[in-house]
Amino acid sequence: MWVAAAPLTFYIALIGLGVIPFFQRHFLYAHTVNSLWWSDINAPEGWGFANGETIYAWHIMPLPLYLQHEARVATQETGLCHDFTRTESFRLLASDPEARLIISFHGNAGHIAQNTRPDSYHALTDTSSYHVLAIDYRGFGHSTGTPDEKGLILDAATVVDWAINVAKIPPNRIVLLGHSLGTAVASGVAERYALQGVEFAGIVLVAAFSDLATMLSGYRFGGLVPALGPFAFWPFFKRILDRYIVDKWHSADRLANIVRHTRNRLRISLVHAKNDMDIPWTEDNKLFRAAAGETIGILDDDEFDSWKESWTVQTSKDSFVTTWKTGEDTIIRQELFPFGGHNDILGFAPVSLAIMRSFDLEGTAYD
């Protein structure tokens, strides 16, 4: 009997700890769960990158550009760089009037070089002309401090400020790329700049969620164990959950606000894998509706579904693309892809294509 009761007791204790802000933030961000005990992320060569192109955050140069300047870049001092502006890598980024920069915001747990993250940087830079700037938020990896919603958005804004004001990359040559938790960070920093009238080349959100309480109601640990167990099926429980969650991460509201405050040009791309076992792909439906709803007015559920269907191309039984364009140069795009899971999708073609479209390298499909 005691053996049978032990898992239930543990689960109830876990839920109880989850309402305490200290434990809740450790559960959410998992920032102390990483491989720094046996990995040195100040030596990115260990993940297959060319020598000499890193800073506190990682700056990953496009490999073709590295090849052109290999003699000077490869002879730079390796390891942690305290003044990136004195490096050849910075000079190549800042002196190129056509440089394109992707600022990458990773998901929870670990650091910028953990698991499949380096593979995604390779996918974006190995054959392109794009620079990638990937950061660890406060409390993650070697970064100091403790993570919270306000702090992570401030970290992201600091990096964007640096890119615009120090590296002199204009916003129309910057794409904000977020994955999982990073989609909430990207949405938060994009909203912050939208309120100032700043418009980026694009906002690409991969495996996103509408808000933390809603996401948790469908989240499964390892894709199998429901985070909230039977509580997820109680309609009033989400309201209780939202009351106790300290970091709300209301991304759907933020996307709507971004659309509302955009005056000229906007590109929002939502990419999700059908076989994502961590965050349900249906979360993108809520984000798309929040963003598109700002341009089409209020529709009831049936009216919106009918409207959306008219702008959707079903590419297979497990995939579709919905593209909504307005006369004000706003494009909101949702793509469901059959494969890629929660993490590997970052290295799949739909993400790279979404970034290309953000930089106005438009194709002809689904127009």
Regions found by a protein language model. Give the residues of each.
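N-terminal membrane-anchoring alpha-helices
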Residues: 1-50, 298-299
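Membrane-embedded segments
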Residues: 52-162
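Intrinsically disordered, low-complexity domain-flanking/linker segments in eukaryotic proteins
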Residues: 64-99, 263-265, 294-326
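Short beta-strand immediately N-terminal to the catalytic nucleophile in serine-hydrolase-like folds
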Residues: 176-178, 204-206, 271
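Gly/Ala-rich beta-loop-alpha elbow adjacent to hydrolase catalytic centers
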Residues: 178-182, 186
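Hydrolase active-site cap/lid region
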Residues: 188-257, 277
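Short beta-strand/loop motif that positions the catalytic acidic residue
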Residues: 262-265, 269-272, 276
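C-terminal catalytic histidine-bearing segment of alpha/beta-hydrolase fold enzymes
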Residues: 278-367
